[in-house]
Amino acid sequence: MIPLRCSSAYSLLIEYCATIRDPCEETYTSRGDHNLSISISLFDQKLEQFHVSLSHATVLVNQSLLPNDACPIQPGILRAISVDAKNLPCVDFPHLCRARGGCLAHHIEYEFVPFAYTERGDTEYMIVVETLGDDADIQFRKFIVMYQRIIAATWKHLCPQTFDCL
């Protein structure tokens, strides 16, 4: 059983440390079946991490930016890799790959990595995010937009049918 609880509103709060010189806040809302609401607060990119609060669960995100000048700006690849105790299947978005000539410099990948959270007896999930490309900021924004679909697809495995994770 996955110790990840879904709220009735299926809300997801993301605080993303992006830039201290140009702080801003963006909100993406999906009014589909999953009713996801994502709020991103941009702060300091040097911290290279953002914090996700999903109902009672907490997800810590660590972002790694690896610039690569060999490839032009292109849409990247989004891949969700689940590596928890239930060995959830991968959620892939291969249609986002528009790389030409085998250039895969612009690649975004993240994975759920569970680790113990003893205070509440729950499990926290760490999402490791790796961004390749000199347009990392653009790619990461695309990642945030697609995050709604990724989480929705992941929740189909975490919370089947009713999304009720008790």
Curated annotation (Swiss-Prot):
Question: What triggers its expression?
Answer: Expression and the subsequent production of PR-toxin take place under static culture conditions (oxygen limited), whereas no expression of the PR-toxin genes occurs under the strongly aerated conditions required for optimal penicillin production. There is a negative control of the transcription of the PR-toxin genes by the penicillin biosynthesis gene product(s), or by a regulatory peptide encoded by a small ORF inside the penicillin gene cluster.
Record's superkingdom?
Eukaryota
Q: What does this protein do?
A: Part of the gene cluster that mediates the biosynthesis of PR-toxin, a bicyclic sesquiterpene belonging to the eremophilane class and acting as a mycotoxin. The first step of the pathway is catalyzed by the aristolochene synthase which performs the cyclization of trans,trans-farnesyl diphosphate (FPP) to the bicyclic sesquiterpene aristolochene. Following the formation of aristolochene, the non-oxygenated aristolochene is converted to the trioxygenated intermediate eremofortin B, via 7-epi-neopetasone.
- Which protein, by its recorded name, is this? PR-toxin biosynthesis cluster protein 10
Q: Which organism is it from?
A: Penicillium rubens (strain ATCC 28089 / DSM 1075 / NRRL 1951 / Wisconsin 54-1255)
The lineage, from the top, is: Eukaryota, Fungi, Dikarya, Ascomycota, Pezizomycotina
